[in-house]
Amino acid sequence: MRSDQIRQGRLAGERSGDLEHFLASMDADRWIARADLLVDMAHLLGLSRQGIIDEAPARALMAALLDLYDHGVPEEAFDERFEDVHAGKEAYLIDRVGEDFGGRLHMGRSRNDEVATCIRIRLKEEIIALLRSLVDLRATLLDVAAGHTGTVMPGFTHLQHAQPTTLAHYLLAYEQAFSRDTARLREAYARVDVSPLGSAAFASTGFPLDRAYTASLLGFSRPAGNSMDAVAARDFAIEVLADASICMTSTSRLCEELVLWSTAFVGFVRLDDAYCSSSSIMPQKKNPDVAEIMRAKAGSVAGSLAAAITITKGLPMSYNRDLQELTPHLWRGVEAARQSIPLLSGMLGSATFDAERMAAEAGRGFSTATELADVLVREYGLPFRTAHRIVGRAVRHGSLDLATLEAAAREAADFSVVELGLTREKIDAVLDPRHAVAVRNIVGGPAPEAVAAQISEQRNLLARDKAWAEETESALSGAFEHLILEARRFAA
């Protein structure tokens, strides 16, 4: 049975199974096993390029690494007696090519810079995947919005009927939020995109490594500028978790409204059966389970963020084993976000919105009262606060008809709106929810023309974000393909 080579120098004795399990990071290490092989290959090419390792051990090691890359890291390397996959893999390599060859791969390197590099590689891939999903979600929102620019519905504040708007205007509000999430993740990617490799434990190394060369092989924009910060920093991970948590907060809000809207007493939307479940006892039930679970996932991602911040808040420079406990929270958080966003896109794209039901609710709760007050200002010259008081008093009396408004004007401001020229026909026209929407034709407003402009502008931004994600993904995968090609040439 292979043993942990790292313990055989300074430490003696055997550990109990409970202690091995407590210290091991194997579950999280499965996320970085492939990235770790890429790091090994880049490091080995760097050692050879600088003349630090001879050709014979370098070729033997590269052949063994390529075999692992092609066929997978053996399960034994994930045994908890090794603490982590790095030690398990090193034991495998030494067993395969001998210690004289296998024991040379770790020259000029520590697990500290090795794992930090692996995490950044995988996190870059996760960011790109999340960005691609956000691009698809935003496209869905824009497409659905484009079909509902004239679908009038109630808008809410405090969950009370407030003012009429359109379904397109509502959906575009969420598209704007997810657009900002995209921007945040793009910015975070730039801070993740630096290579710690070559920083060793924290004080770099006396071996003449070319850190820019290995950074390029691994698809990084540059090497990290300070070797201590390179291994100690996890703020980049916290930043991505924060971005994912903000994104999932918007997701949760949207899911909450889909749950509410799909109820029988609201009836604004019918979710596709694929995104719902039934009851084991109540045969009529159609429960919006996907939206509910997604709503809860937002809490899970926020929990991962809180855990990551708490784990790192009191750590001294530079590397501390506490950071091992952060990594599972990082993977769980980004995975929950990455899984949720495509499902939300599918749920929205397959949903059926009831335009008639929305229109019927659009004028309830005196939702056009604001427009009536505005008309008293724009067309009859009243101060807004006076108009606000008159309309509010009429609402208190239970009606916005001419007689009630006249009584409210005399009661609240001691004058006559009838004498100003207000008519029953004017009131009826103003209180039409479609009128209230149509006159709000300014930048960002719900009028069809304003909404069309928003859709056009956001489609242009979406196209740029989509191109960036595709180009970045292509560049990263291209770097990995080039690395594997160089590794195969080297081993041949």
Curated annotation (Swiss-Prot):
It comes from the Archaea. Its main location: cytoplasm. It catalyses: 2-(N(omega)-L-arginino)succinate = fumarate + L-arginine. It is an enzyme of class 4 (lyase). GO terms for molecular function: argininosuccinate lyase activity. Pathway: Amino-acid biosynthesis; L-arginine biosynthesis; L-arginine from L-ornithine and carbamoyl phosphate: step 3/3. Keywords: Amino-acid biosynthesis, Arginine biosynthesis, Cytoplasm, Lyase. Its EC number is 4.3.2.1. Coiled coil: none annotated. The keyword GTP-binding does not apply. GO terms for cellular component: cytosol. One of its GO terms (biological process) is L-arginine biosynthetic process. It is found in: Cytoplasm. The keyword Ribonucleoprotein does not apply. HAMAP family: Arg_succ_lyase. NCBIfam families: argH. Belongs to the lyase 1 family. Argininosuccinate lyase subfamily. This is Argininosuccinate lyase. It comes from Methanoculleus marisnigri (strain ATCC 35101 / DSM 1498 / JR1). The lineage of its organism: Archaea, Methanobacteriati, Methanobacteriota, Stenosarchaea group, Methanomicrobia.
